[in-house]
Amino acid sequence: VNYGNGVSCSKTKCSVNWGIITHQAFRVTSGVASG
């Protein structure tokens, strides 16, 4: 199952896509900085 926020789970394990999370965090941070 892919939750759409960089976390992807199967029946046996969950994996995190840090690239996606870092990108989202950067977008949020830059949005706050500019807004």
Curated annotation (Swiss-Prot):
InterPro entries recorded: Bacteriocin_IIa, Bacteriocin_IIa_CS, Bacteriocin_IIa_dom_sf
Subcellular location: Secreted
UniProt keywords, alphabetically: Antibiotic, Antimicrobial, Bacteriocin, Secreted
One protein family per Pfam: Bacteriocin_II
Entry's Gene Ontology BP terms: defense response to bacterium; killing of cells of another organism
Keyword Nucleus recorded: no
Activity dependence on pH, as recorded: Stable from pH 3.0-9.0, inactivated at pH 10.0.
Family: Belongs to the bacteriocin class IIA/YGNGV family.
Its biological purpose: Bacteriocin with antibacterial activity against C.jejuni.
Name the UniProt record assigns to this protein: Bacteriocin SRCAM 1580
Native source organism of the sequence: Niallia circulans
Lineage, top ranks: Bacteria, Bacillati, Bacillota, Bacilli, Bacillales
